[in-house]
Amino acid sequence: MPRSLKKGPFVDQHLFVKVARENEKGTKNVIKTWSRRSMIIPDMLGHTIAVHDGRKHIPVFVTESMVGHKLGEFAPTRTFRGHVKDDRKGKRR
């Protein structure tokens, strides 16, 4: 179920302060965050936000089409290495 429009988008306060500070200074430094639950707002456009995936920080460059999505959507947490191929020759009796 989507979030109510009267509540507005959720952004962690510490992340919002960091983005506002970067906008105020006019710089585009990488912002490191663990807040995967924060929604991307128009103030974040053009910034690179390093989102934690549980092991390392994945840099995400925010574009206009990402507004309204959550940061965690762009940093996958699971790595799929593929299924193991069957070795038919080894199964002979």
From Swiss-Prot:
PROSITE patterns named in the record: RIBOSOMAL_S19
UniProt signal peptide: none
Family matches, as Pfam families: Ribosomal_S19 (PF00203)
GO cellular component annotations of the record: cytoplasm; small ribosomal subunit
Gene3D superfamilies: 30s Ribosomal Protein S19, Chain A (3.30.860.10)
Keywords, comma-separated and alphabetical: Ribonucleoprotein, Ribosomal protein, RNA-binding, rRNA-binding
Gene Ontology molecular-function annotations: rRNA binding; structural constituent of ribosome
GO biological process, one term: translation
InterPro entries in the cross-refs: Ribosomal_uS19, Ribosomal_uS19_bac-type, Ribosomal_uS19_CS, Ribosomal_uS19_SF
Similarity annotation: Belongs to the universal ribosomal protein uS19 family.
PANTHER family attached to this UniProt entry: RIBOSOMAL PROTEIN S19P FAMILY MEMBER, SMALL RIBOSOMAL SUBUNIT PROTEIN US19M
Function comment: Protein S19 forms a complex with S13 that binds strongly to the 16S ribosomal RNA.
Name of the protein described by the UniProt record: Small ribosomal subunit protein uS19
Taxonomic path: Bacteria, Bacillati, Actinomycetota, Actinomycetes, Micrococcales
Name of the encoding gene: rpsS
